[in-house]
Amino acid sequence: EEQARLKESPKSYVSSTGVSFRLLEPNYILMGAKRSEEGQRANEVIREVDLTKPFYLGTYEITNSNFMKFKAKNSKGEELISNEEPATNITWNDAALYCNWLSSKEGLQKFYQQIGNKIVGLNLTSNGYRLPTEAEWAWTARSSDKKGVKQIKFPWGNNKTVKQGSGNFADETSKGSVDQFIPNYKDGYSR
């Protein structure tokens, strides 16, 4: 039954609020890092996770303009004022409330149980929007769509040094508008 439902599911769709989603069919991921691995943290252990259910993930980050449809008074930060930039300064609770809001807009069951504006539990049988789990997020960042391709350590590859043009990171042009930036790095997305 699950396989039949998966075949009928669209590979991608756009929500009524304009957010695009893509269906992902994950499998196995090795999470964590070896003790000898550079950057390994004391609380990290290697664990195998088998992701058995497909899930939808937003194709892009939620933008300021989209998040402000839910919460008009969101602080975008002093310098990060473009409506099409990713929403920032959002708590986990607000992100979960956004998921519930989007679920309501789409006529779906809310995933997060809430009392007022506070998340107090989960509805695991819900068909509504939710944040990705840690394993889903790690699989998305570290895997390829190609079957049999080895997992990578970082979205840009296995080298700790970020490759030029790999993404819109806080490079030196962000100095003064963000708390942390990558020194001696230009990502090509200067503002």
Question: In which residue ranges do the predicted regions lie?
Answer:
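Functional-site microenvironments in short loops/helix caps that host divalent-cation chemistry
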Residues: L30, K34-R35, I81, W92-R191
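Extended, compositionally biased low-complexity polar/Lys-Gly-rich tracts
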Residues: E1, K73, K153-F154
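Pro/Ala/Gly-rich low-complexity, hydrophilic intrinsically disordered segments
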Residues: E1-P10
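A short glycine-rich, aromatic-capped structural motif
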Residues: K11-E78, N83-S103, T140
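Short solvent-exposed loop/turn micro-motifs enriched in small/polar/acidic residues
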Residues: R5-L6, R41-A42, G188
